[in-house]
């Protein structure tokens, strides 16, 4: 049996959780797992602004990306288009890039030379721990598109369960 617990602070319950299973899947920040012993990896974060508009359609698509330097946000999401909604109003969300600091949501790793070298040290630590499966964008310190996430999950399952 596989037990899944959601909404649990791993670090507040770490000892209990690690004792509760033969293997633990850790998808959080790898540097945090190792108590930042090699330094703090850097991320980019995001900030969101939501707005209800008194119109049926704002942009005609669920997601429109903006790459122009003069436009401060990187995309607008019009939620009703994910479900082909026909409501008389619409809700949009503007996504803005933001600097990351500890405690913020880490969205994108900053894969420069310094961070990659630091991550390699954490990765080496992770290989010494056969009780924990490190995977996911934060544990792998890598941005993943959805199809790659699925591929990575299948690789981890194959490695862990076909021994």
What is the predicted function of each stretch?
Residues 21, 33-163:
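C-terminal segments that line or cap access tunnels to active or ligand-binding sites in enzymes
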